[in-house]
Amino acid sequence: MESTDQLSKIGKKQLEDGQYENALNSFESAISLNQNDPDLWNLKGIALRSLGRYDEAVECFNKSLEIDPRDKNSS
């Protein structure tokens, strides 16, 4: 089983490569292991935004800010 860090790295690489659906799956897997990491929610939001799923992306960005209101990375 992969760790949240491994899944996050895989997802970031997939984002860079334009594999947005795969990246989304990686970030969702990471979130299932740690639901309180604002960076994971932000990354999931980026993947969703890249897929044109804007409402869901906003929900993820809001969740990231809910966990850490000082998180400047929340898009």
Predicted regions and their residues:
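Register position in tetratricopeptide repeats
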Residues: 16-17, 50
